[in-house]
Amino acid sequence: MKTKNTFLVSTKSETSIGQITQIIGPVLDVSFPPGNLPNIYNSLIVKGQKDDRAFSVTCEVQQLLGNNTVRAVAMSATDGLTRGMKVINTGACLSVPVGKATLGRIFNVLGEPVDNLGPVDTDTTFPIHRPAPAFPQLDTNLSIFETGIKVVDLLAPYRRGGKIGLFGGAGVGKTVLIMELINNIAKAHGGVSVFGGVGERTREGNDLYMEMKESGVINEKNIAESKVALVYGQMNEPPGARMRVGLTALAMAEYFRDVNEQDVLLFIDNIFRFVQAGSEVSALLGRMPSAVGYQPTLSTEMGSLQERITSTKKGSITSIQAVYVPADDLTDPAPATTFAHLDATTVLSRGLAAKGIYPAVDPLDSTSTMLQPEIVGEQHYEIAQGVKQTLQRYKELQDIIAILGLDELSEEDRLTVARARKIERFLSQPFFVAEVFTGSPGKYVSLIETIRGFQMILSGDLDGLPEQSFYLVGNIDEVISS
């Protein structure tokens, strides 16, 4: 716990007071007495009265302008601020509440609860700006993070302490997949999750919260039994809040990893909005834009966030980041910079969702750097490749089937199609968090069971079984017994 205090120590023995000299939208210029300038990233607080109501605006120092003046970005609306108002330098960067008391609660970028459930029952705080773990602290072992979801564990496995990109349009099951992962990490790994809603719709944040309460991920009756903390900085917030809300969520996750020594899942929805907010702030600060109008510091900002997400010898943060691709252009600097950090991609397919195959993870488009024989083992690798080849061949044959029908195919191709259809159905799985809606109990399938099941399908042991018996089941024994 000593590290916490070293970050929070002020450079001055007492806080200094400055005053606002200029306000342009969410950007403030503040002058301080000589020798009392705040550091970059220090938190400033402006207090005032509006309509007989006291308000306070927190800002973060971004630039030193000279002449004892700093430029800061506000974390909330600047309505009611005027030139000449007093500004308090807190002497440290923004700190947010952390620990078990944050589970089941919703916070804003400042770490203030916004769910009307009263104050957070903790005195422990962590600063949102922290250095990435030093090299000796890192855990360099390559190990798979088992999710209990067949299609993910077999074909695009997650790395413990890795970063995964989640791609998918509206209505293909992103939210349900996220909730299932939160549920499974709690049950199988004794871990917790932090969800950072960065610049997305308020309605989506509300829907997610309601669905989490319904599915039991957030326990209303006993909040302490919840499995996730939520941090929201939605589309209507100023760019300063959207730029920093990801760091607030990350600080909460780092506490669970470094102090509680747990495995943590960190969800960021959406990483593109983090870049977008940084671009807005950069323009407001008067920096020269780079390619496609993005901020010149794009790689640095992305790197400082992503490098803190890693495995250490104490615990791990595995991050799943929804990636919005503007105009479906993968070469756009924002997604291109994100891809450089990803270990795996999980692509959700509308075609599979339309067929009723959930989770609608595309087995051919999803990738992982972990799928190598020296990491996952020869058997896992061979079966994953066999599954992909069978599905790829089925995809190639679909045009012929549509025109000529199945009967015109060779015996070998007909067998491939039959097995591919069984594989496709066996990649579906009932989820714990969907029990409320589907009525069928959820299934956690271990990696060993997953490999055994697909090995039996590929070897032809189950050619005599109808394909429908492979649909929405857990392990292969359920198929055989049905």
Swiss-Prot record:
SUPFAM superfamilies: C-terminal domain of alpha and beta subunits of F1 ATP synthase (SSF47917), N-terminal domain of alpha and beta subunits of F1 ATP synthase (SSF50615), P-loop containing nucleoside triphosphate hydrolases (SSF52540)
GO molecular function, one term: ATP hydrolysis activity
Membrane-topology descriptor: Peripheral membrane protein
Subcellular location: Plastid, Chloroplast thylakoid membrane
Metal-binding recorded as keyword: no
Organism in which the protein naturally occurs: Gnetum parvifolium
Quaternary data: F-type ATPases have 2 components, CF(1) - the catalytic core - and CF(0) - the membrane proton channel. CF(1) has five subunits: alpha(3), beta(3), gamma(1), delta(1), epsilon(1). CF(0) has four main subunits: a(1), b(1), b'(1) and c(9-12).
A Gene Ontology cellular-component term: proton-transporting ATP synthase complex
Keyword terms: ATP synthesis, ATP-binding, CF(1), Chloroplast, Hydrogen ion transport, Ion transport, Membrane, Nucleotide-binding, Plastid, Thylakoid, Translocase, Transport
Cited function: Produces ATP from ADP in the presence of a proton gradient across the membrane. The catalytic sites are hosted primarily by the beta subunits.
HAMAP family membership: ATP_synth_beta_bact
Similarity comment text for this entry: Belongs to the ATPase alpha/beta chains family.
Name this polypeptide is given: ATP synthase subunit beta, chloroplastic
Pfam families: ATP-synt_ab (PF00006), ATP-synt_ab_N (PF02874), ATP-synt_VA_C (PF22919)
Transmembrane parts of this sequence: none
Enzyme Commission number(s) of this protein: 7.1.2.2
Binding-site list for ATP: 168-175
GO BP of this protein: proton motive force-driven mitochondrial ATP synthesis
Primary enzyme class: translocase
